[in-house]
Amino acid sequence: MLRIAGERHAALLAGDIGSAQEMALIAAEAPERLMADILLVPHHGSKTSSSGAFLDAVSPQVAIFQVGYRNRYGHPHPQVWQRYGARDIERLRTDAAGAVVIETGGDALEVRTARSMRPRYWSSALEVAALADATEAPADAQP
């Protein structure tokens, strides 16, 4: 796990930690050392990560799910995806958005995605808008 902090914002790159490691971090670290505006979601959003306690401790504004298109593991897990949504955390999936660029000049975060910045010429305006949003639930998510 790596936390990168500037004057106003921080990013937490969680790697492949699971809920047991999340709980150990919560117990061992001062709360301000876990808080981050940007979270690279632990273990691609698997069902063994992103516990509610961890999300509450980190309290991110933006969560990036690093997942491959039609990955064989089904990441992110629908319950994990919903857990982030229930906390009003902006969710981005790299399989839908491509690369994610976040600029932190000032108090606000500016989030852009590769597919919204460089749409394919054959894409319609509606497809580009859907990709730019990239907050769609996984296909197997339950409402």
Regions from the PLM with identified roles:
Residues M1-P76:
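Active-site-proximal loop/helix segments of hydrolase catalytic cores
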Residues Y69-P143:
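Binuclear metal-ion centers of metallo-dependent hydrolases, dominated by the metallo-beta-lactamase
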